C-alpha cells in the first residue's frame, strides 16, 4: 500500500487517474516495486500480467494498457527491456498472455497492438527461448484450429515476425514443416485477408535462399498453380500487393522462374489442387495488372516482368511479347509518374533483346511514345530516369532491323534528333554519356532515309555532341589536381575523359558512315522538296564539308590533347577510321586534308601507334585501321604532289599494291626501321617491299616537315639502301627512287658530300630513267644536290634547272620591280640558287640555254632570276662568260633561221633583254673587246633581218646597241659606230622606223621609236665626229619631224625628247651629216630671202619648231624640258651663225617671257632647276631684256644667295656656273660683294663633289627604252 501511495503521490489529478488505469488496484499493492517502470508511463508489469487476461477488465482498458506499453517500448526501450527480462519465466508468461489476448480478441485494433508489442519485445530481447516460445504458440494455435477462420491474427504475427527476424524463415521451414500445410489451407480459405496474410508470410519465407531451396518441391507440387490463380482473381489491393511481393521473391531464383514461365514441368498433384487454374499464365496475369488504373500495381507488375527477363530475355521475352505486354508498357511511358515511366523503360529495355519484339513492329508503334517520354523526362531532374530512357532509346535504335523503318515521318526523326541534342548537352556526365551511345545508333542510314534527310538537324546534333565533349575535356583540364596525393583522382579523370571521348568519336564515326552510305542515294543528295529557285542548304555536300571542318577544328585537337596524357588503342582505332572515312566523304578535299595531316605529324603518330600496340598479333584491328589510314593518306599525297609531277596510273597502281602489302608488316620504332633500311644483306621480296614502304613514309613525312628521324642517320641509311639495290642488281620503283634522291638531298649536311661510288650508283640508276621529271621533287636542296656534283651536273644540270624553274612559284614580278623602294627579300629557293651561281659560275651558261630553249613562262622566270642575281652581285664579273655564250647562241640562231629570226624562238627577246642588262651593268667606260664587237655585229645583223613589227626583238636589241655606244671609250665608240654603220639592213630598218613616227598613239611602237631616234642621233653624231664611211643614207622629212613635235603623242614625252635629241644633233651639224639627209615633203614654195639664208630650213619651219619647243616646255617634264632647252640652244646657235638678227628676234619674243615665268611658277626655288637656269642663260646671252629684266636677274641672284648650294645636283651646279659666267661676261653683276660671295661659294665646291646629293646614274631604262641622260641633256 505504501508503494502504491508513493507511486501516486505528488502527481496532478488527471495524470494520476491515467496512471491509476495502468495499475490493477486489487493486486498492485502485493507487487514488488521492481516490476514498476520508473518513468512515465508508470507501468507495472505484474499488474499487466493480471489485468490483461482478466475477463472482468474492459476491452478499452486493456487496449489503453497495450498502447501505453507500446509507447514505453518506443520511448524507453532499454528500461522496458530491463523490466521484462528480469525473470525469464515472467517474460515467457507475458508473451503467452499477449498471444492469448491476440487469439481471443476480434477487435482489429487490439490485435494490431498485440502484434506490434509482441514483435517489439521479441526483437528487442533477442532471446532464443522467447522466440521459440512464440513460434510454438503460433504453430500450436494453427494446428488446433478446425478452420482457418480465426487464423488471420496468427498468420499476420508470423509474417511480421519473420520480416523482423529474417533468420526465422529457415527455422520455420526446418522445424515447423507441417506449417506449410496450414498455409495452403489459408490460401484456399475464402477470405482475401487470410490469403493476403499467407502470401505475405510465404514471401518472407521465400526471401531466404535456404528456405526457398527447401520449399522448391512444395512450390512445384502445391503452391504455384494455387498462388497464380489467387493473384489472377484477387480483388483487394492488399492481396494483390502481397501476391506480387511473393512473386518478386520467387522471381529471384532461376528455378522458380522456369517453373512459373513453363508450367509443363508441374506435377499432376499441383494441377489438381482445388482452386487452381491450369490456363492461367504469368504474362496474362501481369498484363491484367498493367491494365489496372492503380499506379502501384502497374509499377509492381513492371518490376515482376523485369525480374523474369533479367534471368534470360531470350527464354522468356517471347511469352510477354505474345501477350502484347510491350504495347501497354509503351502507353505507360506517357504517365506522369516518374517511377512508372522508369519501370516501363527498364522492362522494355530487356524486351528489345528479343528479335520478336521488332518483328511484331512494337517499336514502330511505340517509338513516338519513347521520344515524347524522353523529351518530357529531360525537363525533370530525375537523372536515373534520363539514363534509363536514353538506354531504352539506344537499344531500340541499335537493334531495330534495317528492313523495318523505325521513323515513318521526317518530323518524328527531327524530334528524336532534337531530344538527343538536348540530352548530349546535359550537364550530368552520365546522362550525356548515354545520349552519346543513342546518338551513335541514331545516325544510321535506315533511321535517316525518310525524305527529306534533315542534314541541318544532324549537323546541330553533332555540334552539340562535339561541344559537350570539348567542354568536358576543358573542365577536367582546368580542374587538374596538384600533388602526388591526387594522382589516383587524376588517372580516374583521364580514364573518364577517355571513355567520353571514345563515345563521342563513335558517334562522329557513325555520322561519317552515314555520309558515305548516302553518297549512293540520289534522293539523299539534297532536299527534293526545295523549290528550284530557292537556295539549297540541306545538302549532303554541305553536311560532308561540315564533317571535315568539325573533325579538323574539334575532333583532332581533342584527341591530340588526350594523347598528351594517355593513349587508348580503342580510341585511336575509332579516330583513325574517322580520318580514313573523311577521305571518302569529301573526295575533292582528300589531297588537301592529307597534306594537312602529314604536316601535323600524323605519319609519325600512326607509326608510333603501330610500334607500341601492334607488334606480333596484338591489336590486329588497330593495326589494320592504322595501315588503311596510312595507305590512303600516302596514295593521296603521292597522287597529288605539291611541286612535282604526279605518277602515272601504272606507277600509282604499283605503289598501291606495294603499300597494301607492306604497311601491315611495319610495327617497328624509328631506330629499328632505320637499321632495317640500312641492312646490306640479301633481301627477299617481302622484306624489300617493307623497305620500300619505310622509305616512302620517311619521304612523305620529310616533304611535309615532319622530320622525326635523325637526318644524319637517315642519310646513311638511304645510301646503304641504294647500294644494296645495286649489289643485288635491282631497280627500285620510280617513286621509291624519287624518295631516295629527295631524302639524300635534304639530309645531306653542307660539310658532308657523297662518296664517288655513291654518286656513280645514283647516276647509273638515273640513266635507266627516261625523264628526270619522273624522279624530281621540287626543293632548293635537290637543285643543290644535282648541281654540286660535276658528274650529275654535266648530265642532268640543264634538265633539273628547267624543272626547278618550271615548279617555282615565287613572286618574280615583284623581284623584277626595280622601281620599288628597297630590295625585296629573296625567297629561300633563290638564296640557294644564288649561292650556287656564286660558287659555280658555269651554271649561268645553262641558264642562258634555258632562256633560249625553255617555254616562255619558264624562260621568263630564269631571266628575272638572272637579272636579280646580276643586280645584287655586281662584284661578280661574269659578263665575258655570258656574252661569249650568248654570241654562240646568236650565231647558231642566225645560221639556222637566217631568213626569219623572229620565228626561231619565242625566248629570243628574253635573251636580248638579258644582254642589254649586262651592258647596262657596266658602270664605267670600258674598251669593247672582240666578243663585244662580234656581238654588236651579230645583233645589228639580227636587227637588219627584222621588220618594224618585231618589237619584242628590236627593243632589247636597240637598247643593247645604244648602251654599247654610250658606255665605252671614245675610241671604242668610233669602232662600234663603224661596225653598226656598215649594217645596211639596220640602216634601212631605222629609216622605216623614223617614217612611222606619226603612227597611232596607242601603237606598241612608241618605245621602239624612241630607241630608233636616239640611235639615229647617236649614229649621226659619231659619223660626223669621226668622218666614218656611210653605206646607207637615212632620209628624213623635216616637215614630218616638226609635225611630230607640234602634235606630240599622249604620254610620249620620251619620244619627243628623242626627236629633239636628233634635231639638236642635226642643227649642231648644220644639217651637213653624211648619214642623215633631209628631204622635202611634197611640192615646196619658192624660197624667200630669209629662207635662202637659213637653208635648208625655212623661216616657217623655224617658227614651227620654236612654237613646238615652247609647248613642250610648258609640260614641265624634267627630261623633256632639258631636251627642249638643248634643242633651242642649238637652234639659236644655228640661226645666229646665219642671221644674228633672226636669232635675236627669236630669242626676244614676248612669248618667251610668258614661258619663262610659267616655268618659274612651278614651285619654290624653281629657278634652281637646271633647264630653267640654262633657259635664262640663253636669253641673257642674246640680251633679251624684254624676257628677263635686270631687276629680275637681281631677284634670282638674291634667291641663289639664300639657297643651300650643297643640296644641288651636279647638273644644276653646272647650269648655275654657266648662268654666272654669262652674267659676268655681260657685266650684269652690279653688286660686287654679292658676286664675289656667290663665286666663292661655287668655286669652293669641287666639280666632282659639289653636290650633297648622290650622283644620278647616267644610263637608265625608262619605259623599256635605253636612255643616256647626258646624251639627251647635252
Swiss-Prot record:
Q: Which InterPro entries match?
A: ARM-like, ARM-type_fold, Immune_Signaling-Apoptosis_Reg
Q: Which cysteines are joined by disulfide bonds?
A: none
Cytoplasm keyword on record? no
GO:BP terms for this protein? meiosis I
Highest taxon above the source species = Eukaryota
Instruction: Decide whether keyword Cytoplasm is in the record.
Output: no
Identify the keywords attached in UniProt to this record, alphabetized.
Disease variant, Meiosis
The entry's note on the tissues where this protein occurs is:
Expressed predominantly in testis. Weakly expressed in spleen and thymus. Expressed in the ovaries, Fallopian tubes and uterus.
According to its UniProt entry, the function of this protein is described as: Required for normal meiotic chromosome synapsis. May be involved in the formation of meiotic double-strand breaks (DSBs) in spermatocytes.
The disorder on record is: Hydatidiform mole, recurrent, 3: A disorder characterized by excessive trophoblast development that produces a growing mass of tissue inside the uterus at the beginning of a pregnancy. It leads to abnormal pregnancies with no embryo, and cystic degeneration of the chorionic villi.
* Protein's recorded name: Meiosis inhibitor protein 1
Source species of the chain: Homo sapiens (Human)
Gene name of the encoded protein? MEI1
Amino acid at each position: 500500500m505504501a508503494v502504491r501511495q508513493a507511486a501516486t503521490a505528488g502527481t496532478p489529478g488527471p495524470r494520476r487517474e491515467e496512471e491509476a488505469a495502468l495499475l490493477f488496484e486489487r493486486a498492485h499493492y502485493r507487487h514488488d516495486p521492481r516490476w514498476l517502470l520508473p518513468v512515465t508511463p508508470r507501468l507495472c508489469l505484474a499488474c499487466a500480467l493480471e489485468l490483461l487476461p482478466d475477463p472482468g477488465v474492459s476491452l478499452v482498458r486493456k487496449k489503453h494498457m497495450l498502447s501505453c506499453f507500446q509507447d514505453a517500448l518506443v520511448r524507453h526501450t532499454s528500461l522496458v527491456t530491463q523490466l521484462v527480462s528480469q525473470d525469464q519465466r515472467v517474460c515467457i508468461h507475458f508473451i503467452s498472455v499477449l498471444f492469448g489476448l491476440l487469439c481471443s480478441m476480434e477487435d482489429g485494433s487490439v490485435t494490431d497492438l498485440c502484434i506490434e508489442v509482441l514483435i517489439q519485445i521479441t526483437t528487442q530481447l533477442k532471446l532464443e527461448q522467447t522466440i521459440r516460445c512464440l513460434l510454438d504458440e503460433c504453430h500450436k494455435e494453427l494446428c488446433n484450429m478446425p478452420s482457418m477462420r480465426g487464423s488471420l491474427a496468427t498468420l499476420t504475427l508470423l509474417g511480421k515476425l519473420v520480416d523482423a527476424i529474417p533468420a526465422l524463415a529457415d527455422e520455420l521451414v526446418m522445424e515447423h514443416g507441417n506449417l506449410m500445410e496450414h498455409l495452403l489451407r489459408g490460401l484456399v480459405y475464402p477470405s482475401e485477408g487470410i490469403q493476403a496474410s499467407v502470401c505475405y508470410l510465404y514471401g518472407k519465407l521465400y526471401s531466404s535462399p535456404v528456405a526457398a531451396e527447401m520449399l522448391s518441391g512444395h512450390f512445384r507440387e502445391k503452391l504455384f498453380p494455387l498462388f497464380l490463380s489467387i493473384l489472377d482473381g484477387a480483388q483487394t489491393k492488399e492481396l494483390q500487393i502481397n501476391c506480387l511481393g511473393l512473386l518478386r521473391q520467387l522471381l529471384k531464383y532461376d528455378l522458380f522462374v522456369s517453373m512459373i514461365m513453363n508450367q509443363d514441368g508441374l506435377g499432376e498433384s499441383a494441377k489438381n489442387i482445388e482452386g487452381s487454374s491450369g490456363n492461367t499464365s504469368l504474362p496474362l496475369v501481369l498484363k491484367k495488372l498493367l491494365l489496372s488504373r492503380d499506379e502501384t500495381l502497374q509499377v509492381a507488375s513492371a518490376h515482376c516482368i523485369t525480374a523474369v527477363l533479367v534471368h534470360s530475355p531470350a527464354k522468356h521475352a517471347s511469352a510477354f511479347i505474345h501477350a502484347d505486354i510491350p504495347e501497354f508498357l509503351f502507353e505507360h511511358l506517357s504517365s506522369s509518374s516518374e517511377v512508372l515511366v522508369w519501370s516501363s523503360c527498364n522492362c522494355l529495355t530487356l524486351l528489345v533483346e528479343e528479335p520478336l519484339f521488332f518483328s511484331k513492329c512494337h517499336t514502330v508503334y511505340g517509338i513516338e511514345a519513347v521520344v515524347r517520354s524522353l523529351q518530357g523526362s529531360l525537363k525533370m531532374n530525375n537523372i536515373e530516369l534520363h539514363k534509363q530512357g536514353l538506354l531504352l532509346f539506344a537499344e531500340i535504335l541499335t537493334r531495330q532491323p534495317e528492313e523495318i523503318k523505325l521513323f515513318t515521318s521526317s518530323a518524328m526523326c527531327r524530334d528524336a534528333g532534337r531530344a538527343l541534342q538536348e540530352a548530349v548537352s546535359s550537364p550530368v556526365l552520365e546522362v550525356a554519356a548515354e545520349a552519346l551511345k543513342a546518338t551513335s545508333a541514331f545516325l544510321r542510314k535506315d533511321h535517316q532515309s525518310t525524305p527529306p534527310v534533315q542534314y541541318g538537324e544532324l549537323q546541330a546534333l553533332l555540334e552539340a555532341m562535339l561541344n559537350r565533349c570539348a567542354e568536358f575535356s576543358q573542365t577536367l583540364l582546368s580542374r587538374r589536381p596538384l600533388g602526388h596525393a591526387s594522382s589516383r583522382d587524376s588517372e580516374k579523370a583521364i580514364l573518364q575523359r577517355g571513355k567520353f571521348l571514345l563515345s563521342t568519336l563513335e558517334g562522329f564515326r557513325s555520322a561519317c558512315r552515314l555520309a558515305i552510305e548516302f553518297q549512293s542515294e540520289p534522293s539523299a543528295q539534297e532536299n527534293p522538296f526545295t523549290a528550284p529557285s530557292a537556295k539549297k542548304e540541306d545538302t549532303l555536300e554541305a553536311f560532308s564539308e561540315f564533317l571535315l571542318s568539325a573533325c579538323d577544328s574539334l575532333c583532332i585537337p581533342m584527341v591530340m590533347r588526350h594523347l598528351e596524357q594517355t593513349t587508348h588503342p580503342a580510341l585511336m582505332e575509332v579516330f583513325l577510321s574517322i580520318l580514313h572515312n573523311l577521305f571518302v566523304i569529301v573526295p575533292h578535299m582528300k589531297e588537301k586534308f592529307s597534306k594537312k595531316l602529314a604536316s601535323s605529324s600524323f605519319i609519325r603518330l600512326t607509326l608510333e601507334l603501330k610500334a607500341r600496340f601492334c607488334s606480333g598479333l596484338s591489336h590486329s584491328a588497330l593495326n589494320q585501321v592504322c595501315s588503311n589510314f596510312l595507305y590512303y593518306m600516302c596514295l593521296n599525297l603521292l597522287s597529288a604532289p605539291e611541286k612535282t609531277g604526279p605518277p602515272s596510273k601504272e606507277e600509282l597502281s604499283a605503289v598501291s599494291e606495294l603499300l597494301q602489302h607492306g604497311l601491315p608488316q611495319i610495327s617497328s620504332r624509328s631506330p629499328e626501321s632505320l637499321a632495317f633500311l640500312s641492312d646490306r644483306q640479301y633481301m627477299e621480296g617481302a622484306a624489300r617491299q617493307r623497305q620500300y614502304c619505310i622509305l616512302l613514309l620517311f619521304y612523305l613525312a620529310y616533304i611535309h616537315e615532319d622530320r622525326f628521324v635523325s637526318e644524319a642517320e637517315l642519310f646513311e641509311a638511304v645510301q646503304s639502301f641504294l647500294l644494296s639495290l645495286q649489289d643485288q642488281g635491282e631497280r627500285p620503283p620510280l617513286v621509291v627512287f624519287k624518295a631516295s634522291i629527295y631524302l639524300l638531298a635534304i639530309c645531306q649536311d653542307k660539310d658532308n658530300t657523297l662518296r664517288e661510288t655513291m654518286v656513280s650508283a645514283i647516276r647509273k640508276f638515273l640513266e635507266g630513267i627516261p625523264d628526270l621529271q619522273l624522279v624530281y621533287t621540287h626543293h632548293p636542296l635537290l637543285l643543290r644536290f644535282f648541281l654540286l656534283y660535276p658528274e650529275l651536273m654535266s648530265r642532268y644540270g640543264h634538265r633539273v634547272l628547267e624543272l626547278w624553274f618550271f615548279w617555282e612559284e615565287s613572286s618574280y614580278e615583284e623581284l623584277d620591280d626595280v622601281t620599288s623602294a628597297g630590295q625585296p627579300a629573296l625567297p629561300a629557293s633563290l638564296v640557294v640558287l644564288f649561292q650556287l651561281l656564286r660558287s659555280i659560275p658555269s651554271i649561268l651558261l645553262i641558264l642562258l640555254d634555258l632562256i633560249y630553249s625553255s617555254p616562255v613562262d619558264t624562260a621568263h622566270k630564269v631571266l628575272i632570276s638572272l637579272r636579280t642575281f646580276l643586280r645584287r652581285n655586281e662584284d661578280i664579273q661574269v659578263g665575258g662568260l655570258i656574252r661569249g655564250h650568248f654570241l654562240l647562241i646568236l650565231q647558231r640562231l642566225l645560221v639556222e633561221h637566217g631568213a626569219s629570226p623572229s620565228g626561231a624562238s619565242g625566248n629570243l627577246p628574253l635573251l636580248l633583254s638579258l644582254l642589254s642588262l649586262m651592258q647596262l651593268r657596266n658602270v664605267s667606260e670600258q674598251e669593247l673587246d672582240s666578243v663585244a664587237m662580234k656581238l654588236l655585229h651579230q645583233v645589228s645583223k639580227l636587227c637588219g633581218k627584222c621588220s618594224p613589227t618585231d618589237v619584242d626583238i628590236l627593243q632589247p636589241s636597240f637598247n643593247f646597241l645604244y648602251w654599247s655606244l654610250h658606255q665605252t671609250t671614245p675610241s671604242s665608240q668610233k669602232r662600234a659606230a663603224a661596225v653598226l654603220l656598215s649594217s645596211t639592213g639596220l640602216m634601212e630598218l631605222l629609216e622605216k622606223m623614223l617614217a612611222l613616227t606619226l603612227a597611232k598613239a596607242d601603237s606598241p611602237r612608241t618605245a621602239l621609236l624612241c630607241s630608233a631616234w636616239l640611235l639615229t642621233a647617236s649614229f649621226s653624231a659619231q659619223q660626223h665626229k669621226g668622218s666614218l664611211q656611210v653605206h646607207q643614207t637615212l632620209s628624213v622629212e623635216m616637215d614630218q619631224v616638226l609635225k611630230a613635235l607640234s602634235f606630240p603623242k599622249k604620254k610620249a614625252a620620251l619620244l619627243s625628247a628623242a626627236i629633239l635629241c636628233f634635231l639638236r644633233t642635226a642643227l649642231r651639224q648644220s644639217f651637213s651629216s653624211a648619214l642623215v639627209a633631209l628631204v622635202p615633203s611634197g611640192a615646196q614654195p619658192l624660197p624667200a630671202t630669209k629662207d635662202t639664208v637659213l637653208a635648208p630650213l625655212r623661216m616657217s619651219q623655224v617658227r614651227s619648231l620654236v612654237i613646238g619647243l615652247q609647248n613642250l616646255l610648258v609640260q614641265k617634264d624634267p627630261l623633256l624640258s632639258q631636251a627642249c632647252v638643248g634643242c633651242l640652244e642649238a637652234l639659236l646657235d644655228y640661226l645666229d651663225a646665219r642671221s644674228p638678227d633672226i636669232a635675236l628676234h627669236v630669242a626676244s619674243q614676248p612669248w618667251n617671257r610668258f614661258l619663262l615665268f610659267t616655268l618659274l611658277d612651278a614651285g619654290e626655288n624653281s629657278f634652281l632647276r637646271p633647264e630653267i637656269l640654262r633657259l635664262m642663260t640663253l636669253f641673257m646671252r642674246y640680251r633679251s631684256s624684254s624676257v628677263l629684266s635686270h631687276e629680275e636677274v637681281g631677284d634670282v641672284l638674291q634667291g641663289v644667295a639664300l639657297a643651300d648650294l650643297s643640296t644641288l645636283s651636279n647638273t644644276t651646279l653646272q647650269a648655275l656656273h654657266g648662268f654666272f659666267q654669262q652674267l659676268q661676261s655681260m657685266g650684269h653683276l652690279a653688286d660686287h660683294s654679292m658676286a664675289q660671295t656667290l663665286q666663292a661659294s661655287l668655286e669652293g665646291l669641287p666639280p666632282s663633289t659639289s653636290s650633297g646629293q648622290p650622283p644620278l646614274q647616267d644610263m637608265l631604262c625608262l619605259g623599256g627604252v635605253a636612255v643616256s641622260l647626258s646624251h639627251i641633256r647635252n
